[in-house]
């Protein structure tokens, strides 16, 4: 299965009639393995901030999480495994695997819980597959 099919079939899937607004799988170096059409262009310093927060949980909390130049308020995640951000009626979930970062962006009517489920389910599968 190609990385693009993971994005198309497993991240951009239908969840109770809703879909993520954007999704991607990136290498931990920030290289894009696959992405949806509306996934924002991330800056190197934004990837560095994400990596730093996974190493030092809470690093992004004072300044916020920036993705594609947009600021997200960091909300409770899972130390070293998941970063969650909120911006208005939407947000983002980022799941770290052994080799990758799985991103999912959502907006109403999709909920943060639905986004978490989709992103973390694929992330857990990749971890089990040692990816």
Curated annotation (Swiss-Prot):
SMART domains: PROF. InterPro entries: PFN, PFN_euk, PFN_sf, Profilin_CS. Induction: Down-regulated by light. GO terms for cellular component: cytoplasm; cytosol; mitochondrion; nucleolus; nucleus; phragmoplast; plasma membrane; plasmodesma. Binds to actin monomers and regulates the organization of the actin cytoskeleton. At high concentrations, profilin prevents the polymerization of actin, whereas it enhances it at low concentrations. At low concentrations, associates with the poly-proline motif of formins to enhance actin filament elongation rate. Binds ACT1, ACT7 and ACT11 and inhibits actin polymerization. Coordinates the stochastic dynamic properties of actin filaments by modulating formin-mediated actin nucleation and assembly during axial cell expansion. Binds G-actin and poly-L-proline in vitro. Keywords: Actin-binding, Allergen, Cytoplasm, Cytoskeleton, Plant defense. The keyword Cytoplasm applies. Pfam families: Profilin. Occurs in many kinds of cells as a complex with monomeric actin in a 1:1 ratio. This is Profilin-1. The gene is PRF1. It is found in: Cytoplasm, Cytoskeleton; Cytoplasm. Disruption phenotype: Delayed germination. In young seedlings, excessive numbers of root hairs, abnormal raised cotyledons, elongated hypocotyls, and elongated cells in the hypocotyl. Defects in rosette leaf and inflorescence development. One of its GO terms (biological process) is inflorescence development. Belongs to the profilin family.
């Amino acid at each position: 299965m190609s990385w693009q099919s993971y994005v198309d079939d497993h991240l951009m899937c239908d969840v109770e009639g809703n879909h993520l607004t954007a999704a991607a799988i990136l290498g931990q170096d920030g290289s894009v393995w696959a992405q949806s059409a509306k996934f924002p262009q991330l800056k190197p310093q934004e990837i560095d901030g994400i990596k730093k927060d996974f190493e030092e949980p809470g690093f992004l909390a004072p300044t916020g999480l920036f993705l594609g130049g947009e600021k997200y308020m960091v909300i409770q995640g899972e130390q070293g495994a998941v970063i969650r951000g909120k911006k208005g009626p939407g947000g983002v979930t980022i799941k770290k695997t052994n080799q990758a970062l799985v991103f999912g962006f959502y907006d109403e009517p999709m909920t943060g819980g639905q986004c978490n489920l989709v992103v973390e389910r694929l992330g857990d599968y990749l971890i089990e597959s040692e990816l």
